[in-house]
């Protein structure tokens, strides 16, 4: 740990702690943060304040002549002018100057030295520094000594609100990025995930410029060196399924695919912790120990034991820990070209097969669609699922238009003969309220069969509604759950629900039809007689 002169950033605190050790950050948090406590496991528990999740409606990107033609402008990437960005940056600097103690975390984004980014975090909460200590790739003492000027700087003044009267502001929260300045400013939210996703957004912009595909996915590697990618929206099982005791974890959330293979962007994991148990997710459960940050969790005031089932603060409880806290993590987080690409969906309608083989065209269709479905809510009378479509299984983080990422993925699939699969971790045996979630042990068995090649060789039957090739048998999985229509007591009700979902797919894909090749559009679901 060393002090750092921050005057070049307009910040001159009494004390600056640079790359402080977790033990020191624990002390700082306990001493200066009234929400901090040490859990029974040794992890640091903390509250993020009013915001317990990301604020996508408050994200802004500076519109600049050098980059404006690259960016997918719209509700995902809303513009801010450079002058307003500078106003917000000065507001953040002014706030940070009122703090006696400032924490700096320098680290890398990207395990491949040829593509990594030097990142500097400037913040006023010890927990934010510890969080990014976990999430960035931690430099060695030699690397820290020669770190030099960063490629990207985050000013985290999340305890201080934005001025709602400032141009382009929609609330007291503002998360602003300038690709030209290589800076990010956070105001009005203390949710640590904003920093993580800010780094990802920058990588999502810079990497495609180098012909490197950036992806919202997890990745793992078998003992023979075979690599699998797992794409999926929140709650589909991306983190759970990639933390496989029989495979090495490359990473759980953000990766890039270059001409040399895949590499993890991060040095840690940010796992959802609601309902966490040692029986279901032992790798994640056992990673929660000294050095881990537990965000917005309820614990017993006497024993300090965490209740993972208590969501009274938020459903979005999280654990942040270094990658090497996973027993079979691969360090450095790099692997070869993927052999299997697995798209995960949580289909709450109960109509999609639990596993199916995709053609390259179907892979592109489902990548652009990025479908999952969740229950609408807990209000009385609300019992229908809501479909969610998120391009590239991570539209919230895309910078370029989705078709750019899809075309890059298609090129890499063709160049490296990767197999593509669609795995439904959602409902089977009937509609929501009647059916049940596909048991995790069955989903794991399907993933195992993909990895050992038995599912590729298994006999398959084309499912008529979605046009997917469905295996008729899979080791350690009951055959009668593989065809979804056959699991419903009322086949006609299945047909009606499936037709409804097909219509939602079609409605969503219309916005991409002009850019997508006809073969990709035709690879989508088509209703036929059952």
From Swiss-Prot:
GO molecular function, one term: phosphoenolpyruvate carboxykinase (ATP) activity
Cellular component annotations (GO), alphabetically ordered: cytosol
Pfam family, one: PEPCK_ATP
Listed GO biological process terms: gluconeogenesis
Positions that bind Mn(2+): 197, 216, 253
Reaction equation(s) it catalyzes: oxaloacetate + ATP = phosphoenolpyruvate + ADP + CO2
Disulfide partners: none
Primary location recorded for the protein, binned into one broad class: cytoplasm
InterPro entries: PEP_carboxykinase_ATP, PEP_carboxykinase_C, PEP_carboxykinase_N, PEPCK_ATP_CS
SUPFAM superfamilies tied to this protein: PEP carboxykinase N-terminal domain, PEP carboxykinase-like
Keyword Mitochondrion tagged: no
Keywords in alphabetical order: ATP-binding, Cytoplasm, Decarboxylase, Gluconeogenesis, Lyase, Manganese, Metal-binding, Nucleotide-binding
EC number: 4.1.1.49
Protein residues bound to substrate: 54, 191, 197, 318
Obligatory cofactor(s): Mn(2+)
UniProt cross-references to HAMAP family, sorted A to Z: PEPCK_ATP
Its biological purpose: Involved in the gluconeogenesis. Catalyzes the conversion of oxaloacetate (OAA) to phosphoenolpyruvate (PEP) through direct phosphoryl transfer between the nucleoside triphosphate and OAA.
Family: Belongs to the phosphoenolpyruvate carboxykinase (ATP) family.
Protein's recorded name: Phosphoenolpyruvate carboxykinase (ATP) 2
Organism: Salinibacter ruber (strain DSM 13855 / M31)
Lineage: Bacteria, Pseudomonadati, Rhodothermota, Rhodothermia, Rhodothermales
